[in-house]
Curated annotation (Swiss-Prot):
CDD domains: PHP_HisPPase_Ycdx_like. The lineage of its organism: Bacteria, Pseudomonadati, Pseudomonadota, Gammaproteobacteria, Enterobacterales. One of its GO terms (molecular function) is phosphatase activity. It comes from Yersinia pestis bv. Antiqua (strain Angola). This is Probable phosphatase YpAngola_A2446. Binds 3 Zn(2+) ions per subunit. PANTHER family: PHOSPHATASE YCDX-RELATED. GO terms for biological process: bacterial-type flagellum-dependent swarming motility. SMART domains: POLIIIAc. Zn(2+) 2 binds at residues 15, 40, 194. Belongs to the PHP family. Its EC number is 3.1.3.-. Homotrimer. Its cofactor is Zn(2+). Pfam families: PHP (PF02811).
Length: 245
């Protein structure tokens, strides 16, 4: 069990079913020490309004010993790597995930998908690329792993890709984990929970990690401190309320 979950959605993304309060309660049951709420960026049809992300400053940082990060799963929009988290929104979030979603960036060929993903990393704002193993978006796996290491961006192993969505992702996810291992990059684990009961469930990710002998020291979820150190190293401000996690 990893004590950090970096990808989940609330009822603010209306195809999800749990609230922030639900996730806090579930985290306490599962001994999850830190999680990031990452609702969809505003270019998705059922995403929260811009104001939702700007007003996350009202959230407490720590509730009953559980740390809460303010995040977003932004959408990669084009071949230039532009995303729908810009301007003041960049300062409103602690954790910025970005990925491909069909309503915003329809699947293209391997060269175009690879170009867009690497361009997104090169812009310097994104911390994690979400579900890069989606078979609908073929990419040059060694190239994206090398770019992720170069730009200090984590590639995600998404547990939901093995269970509920993006069928056929497993072979790509295994290859991505191995390529990130060889490139010396970071892996991030995300439950991609759309209901609180799935918080912190990484069983499929853990199997892939074991199969490719991925080093634990390159997984962001190993401890709250590792994730917070990474974000600070990437230029995010220190969060004093979470210093003791």
């Amino acid at each position: 069990m990893y004590p950090v979950d970096l990808h989940m959605h609330t009822v603010a993304s209306t195809h999800a079913y749990s609230t922030l309060h639900d996730y806090i309660a579930e985290a306490k049951l599962k001994n999850i020490k830190l999680f990031a709420i990452t609702d969809h960026g505003p270019d998705m049809a059922d995403a929260p309004h811009y104001w939702h992300f700007m007003n996350m400053r009202v959230w407490p940082r720590l509730v009953d010993g559980v740390g809460i990060l303010r995040g977003i799963e932004a959408n990669i929009k084009n071949l230039d790597g532009d995303i729908d988290c810009t301007g003041p929104m960049l300062d409103a979030v602690d954790l910025l995930i970005a990925g491909f979603h069909e309503p915003v960036f329809p699947p293209q060929d391997k060269a175009a998908n690879t170009q867009a993903m690497i361009a997104t990393m090169a812009q310097g704002n994104v911390h994690i690329i979400s579900h890069p193993g989606n078979p609908k978006y073929p990419v040059d796996i060694p190239a994206i792993a090398q770019a992720a290491a170069k730009y200090n961006v984590a590639l995600e192993l998404n547990n939901s890709s093995f269970a509920h969505s993006r069928k056929g992702s497993e072979a790509n996810c295994r290859a991505i984990a191995a390529a990130v291992r060889d490139a010396g990059g970071w892996l991030a684990l995300g439950s991609d929970s759309h209901i609180a009961y799935a918080l912190g469930i990484f069983e499929h990710c853990e199997r892939i990690i074991a199969e490719v002998n991925f080093p634990q020291e390159r997984i962001l979820n190993v401890s709250p401190r590792r994730l917070l150190d990474y974000l600070e190293q990437r230029g995010r401000p220190v969060i004093p309320e979470l210093a003791e996690l």
